[in-house]
Amino acid sequence: MARPLKEGLDYFPLDVDADYDDKFQLIETLHGPTGFAIMIKLFMKIYSQNFYYKWTETEQILFAKRVNVDINTLKTVVNDCIKYDLFDNNLFSEFQILTSLGVQERYFTAIGRRKKQIVVLEYLLLDRPEVINLCPKIVFANINVVNDDINAEQEELMPALSAQTKGKESKVNESKAVVSEQEKLPEKIVKEKPTTTAYKFWEENVAITGLSEFDRELLKKLISLGGNELTVHAMKKAIELNRRRMKTVDTVLRGWLDNGVKTTAEADEQEKNWNGGAKKNARAEPAKQEIKISDQYNFGATRTD
């Protein structure tokens, strides 16, 4: 049986002037030395585990005990860390994990050319090519998919995904632990994320040869504005309009956000209301040309070619 995969780091880099960083200073100003100490302890915990750390009620209780801090104080400090972008808000809201772009850059730089390393795509803030460049033998996986055709090498890696929540188990039971953890995944995640990330959705349905650098940067901004799920919904709308460009996704998503849309259900309702209004106006003024859905997004004149 292969030796269990080591995912964490033994040490991590910390700038000597880290306490002068604006984000650090905000937390220290709000919460004093206790807040600063909690931040450092959190980074230690994250790097010792992976490039992220699960932050559910269980981890909060145990962490509060380890650092000898009242749990309410701990929650307040961590919430402010998320609020002021020390940790990514979108990934915390969706997956209850603590991570950031800086953490991921330092982590993947540190592990370098490890023989094998498995990475959950949904947890990544870095672009996939960046990760592969730093770690050529990386193995990507989806959080809510168990592939029946995983080869023997990957089967040895998969138990590492559940290490934080299941703890140490005998090597004999490692393969069973993978199935058990996948079955315990929250039903909400399974229902809401059947297609993985916005990047993968666009590549599979539109940009078959991959995203351009411009589109990739724009998509990053869109996900930070509307979140992964709403961005994918805007992609589907762009495809429905037969305007398969990232700028179209940008226009659709920003149009929703400008009207206070926060969920896919609200987006559908917005589209329904707009379409209903367009049809009503068309009946009241039959002499006018019927309004097309593209007008809502200011695409300009309809092409005839």
From Swiss-Prot:
Ranges in coiled-coil conformation: none
Region (Disordered): 267-287
Family in the record: Belongs to the DnaB/DnaD family.
One Pfam family matching this protein: DnaB_2
InterPro entries: DnaD-like_sf (IPR034829), DnaD_dom (IPR006343), Lin1244/Lin1753-like_N (IPR025400)
Protein name: Uncharacterized phage-related protein Lin1244/Lin1753
Native organism: Listeria innocua serovar 6a (strain ATCC BAA-680 / CLIP 11262)
